[in-house]
């Protein structure tokens, strides 16, 4: 394929290209020392075989031999080649073998695999022992280690185990040394549990710790049978290794404690520095510190040391680990694997895309070539067609020049008339503008009046609410004042009572003091006199002994009776006080009831007065509402009648205007036709046929339809242009009016055959019956294919079908081809066509008398309308007054009702108080039984008191008689002294009685004072509360009155503004009526001027029609626009091509109806005249249309018209007879564009694939280089380690496929001392252990890990090898911590720290011992 950027051969070759490109240039750029070992300078450079695109993969293990520095490729070493081996470096100075082996030792090749391909070319390169000296290797190690050197490392200081496995309670294992510690103890003591505890903290599962579940890790013994949890805490510290070989603790970094706790429910928790954490955080932390938890290099368990070296060369499954994956993860090249796989998948997808795009490209190329011949033919046709269009353009422009010269004079006259009409219109527009301004002002005033009315209603409602609030507050004020007056009256009387009671109490207290003083004096006197009396009696003791004893006996008997008398006397006083209190209470309650009943009677009287007032106001309101409702009905009826009158008035105005216009047209038409008919009869003109509408007939039912669809039925039909010109000259000369003419000789022959119409609706032309067939063309020229529909629905269905039609309905609605709809309205056009019944077409014509009559009727109707409008306005004003008075009545009613409601609530409260007072009085009166009880009790007490006095009277008389006897015995002296004593006693009794009476009165007065003070406090509190409440209410009442005053002010302002606005509205109404009169006058003037313009425009129409046809023909000319297509054919300019090509197509000009004889016709004519200018080449563009030049007037006059017409005929014949598909150019252009697009698309796809290939090569090269660099270091370190451990053996890591290390993996080959090369699987147990340890130590040297835990790795080793391993761990691995469990003394004796483990009572314990000898030696 000629233009394909990628041939099939190239594509096949590219598909066979290897995934990894290893060219000489890349090898030369790779100069990293650590990726290769330089060969001797004297070694000749080998001839490398050319790398084939596809190569077979071999699974045969081969020994890796490195080439020179200029070439980094590896080759398999054949078994039959004899070469010197790599010199095995030693960390110690080389010594001569005791067995006589030379320093230059030569390695033997590993055994060939049976499956090794014999066809592969292999080169054996001899390595230089000098170049591979110990010094060179040491440089490589130092360079690598310096890049990964750390400042400090992590080590385990101690383990704290609590109830973990065999460790009961809390046991501390350690501390451990920073480098080499050994865990020792007898079998079964729990040494391996130390490692299990570390694994437990590092997140290993229970099965790795030789248990099934986590709960099995909890210690269980006879002493501790049911512990719930166990825990292990690993205490880490950071240590810095000094260059001297010692180490010190890094004090700047704090220690790290990681704890894990397991529970009986098999769950566990992690802690970092005693804060709860998670498995993820713990493992992330340990990995960041360099502990390899992925491949577990730090952990070598019992019996697992051999597994490291026995790994397969490459993992068989993705989930497995082989030696290749093991090394890649350590070296770090495993990160490249997903990127390489992603790029390889992209290349496969892109190869498919390239193949698909190439196939598409070939198809497009074939299609493009098949269109070449058609393209050339189409280009020739386009050239001829362009010449024909240019010639036609010249001919049209020449004819236009002739027509424009005829038009100039006509335009001047029309321009003058238009100017006059515009002046009148400007005046009219100013009047209209003023009317609109007045209407806007009236509307604004009306809105403001409406706003005032709304505000008025709002103020009325607000006043109603404020009045209600005021009444409520005034009633509350009255109640509070009444309450305060009552409280103050009570307060005054209470103060007076308190004053009287306090005075009485003070007086009684004075009397009490006076009586007490007198009693005291009398008591002293009585004692004195009694002492004298006793002395006298003592002197008469013997004489009166018996009598005195008798008196004493009687007095003792009388003593209880005296006590009873005193008690009865006290009870009588209490009963008298209770009786007095009951009588006083009843009197007060009776007085309270009488006062409340008087108040209720007054309130009821006031309430009745309010109810009568409300009833009267409601009657007035109902009467007002009825009156307003009736007024609204009358106003609505009058308003509707006014609107009807206005509609009739407007219709009459329209009729008057139409009558005037019709009269003017009829007079003009009649004059024109009559004059031209006379001219025909006189023989001065030939070929005049009359009005077009009179030259045929149509059915009556289509009169409105044809009159609406064809206003040109008023056109005059003549045979020739000359006849029409004579007619125009005659009309202009005699100023008879204007006419529009149809020239039969200039009409082209139309296809008059019937057409297929939607729904078979009739064509208007087919319904006309011409008087003479020669008039058919004239009718068709004005009617065309206009259809007649029965209704608007059918007209819509017909007009908007697949093919557009001009449709008119029988009732005069017209749908044009453009989709515009017209017709309808109050005035229906009719009478333009002669009807089949020969009815006159003068139905809508008016005589001057009829026009005068119509205008008189219009004036009368306008006067009636004005009177009716004033009456309606008066009704509206009266109705408004009624509406305004209604809220006042409602406010008065609301106020009275609120006052009545307030009074009713007060009355209810007063009645409730009366009921309570009556109930209290009735209760007090009904408690007569209590009063009777008190009175009876008082009588009973008095009777008992009298009885007691009667009982004691006899004894007192006996005592009196006995005392008289003593008096007789004592003589006058005794009698006189006894009289003194009795006199004093009587006085004392009188005073004691008075004192008791005073104390009782004082106690009562004190109670009255307390009671009056309590009443005083209550009254004062009531007065204070009422006063505060009264202040609040007075403040509210003040604000309410202010709000009412403000409301009144706003109401007055609103009403005044409303009156003012109404006056302004009336003034504007009068102005608007005056303006409307001037507008009506303008309409009459406008009709006259339009009639004049119609006459001028009819003269212009014919000239314009000729120019329009010529311009139409000129404008329809266009050169086929193939510029875009030809540009697409230009290969040099083609960048991107669109598939769509636009062509200029000739648009069919549909018939457009001529201007109607109304205002729109005249406006269109004015606009066309104003915008039309004769063709002026200098003032227009240089081109008629694209590619067609516009000629100047001089150029047009110099044209040879006959020659142009001859050429047009010749070219027209060629164009019509030649059958050419122009679309082939577009198709060819599209194919060419697609060809280039496909080509560019294919090139981009190939470029993208090559870019991905290049990225893949870079990734593979990076992976290969980095892996080989690390692999060589590890391999050479392995040699060193194995030779050191085995004292003369050799070990190598080899690539199974030396050309591609990642295809078959890595194998581990070992040559034990004095033996040949062997695979790791063929070694003994001890040899496997030594090989694995050598690999572990080599990996440690390449990528150290800070911690190693080894469990009896020396089990399969003899004494010598154990010592070698132990010494290596002690001397060469001081940059890591080794914790080794061992039972071999030549292993643990070299440790700096010994951790002893022993078991007692099934519980493991630990102790730590420092190896002083070793520490002193170091």
From Swiss-Prot:
Cell division as UniProt keyword: yes
MF (Gene Ontology): ATP binding; ATP hydrolysis activity; chromatin binding
Start and end residues of each stretch annotated as Disordered: 1-122
Any one GO cellular component localisation term in the record: cytoplasm
Phosphothreonine PTM positions: 43
Modified residues annotated as N-acetylserine in this record: 2
Residue ranges occupied by any SMC hinge domain in the UniProt entry: 686-799
Further details from the record: Present with 573 molecules/cell in log phase SD medium.
PANTHER family found in the cross-reference section: STRUCTURAL MAINTENANCE OF CHROMOSOMES PROTEIN (PTHR18937:SF172), STRUCTURAL MAINTENANCE OF CHROMOSOMES SMC FAMILY MEMBER (PTHR18937)
Function field: Central component of the condensin complex, a complex required for conversion of interphase chromatin into mitotic-like condense chromosomes. The condensin complex probably introduces positive supercoils into relaxed DNA in the presence of type I topoisomerases and converts nicked DNA into positive knotted forms in the presence of type II topoisomerases.
Protein name listed in UniProt: Structural maintenance of chromosomes protein 4
Organism: Saccharomyces cerevisiae (strain ATCC 204508 / S288c)
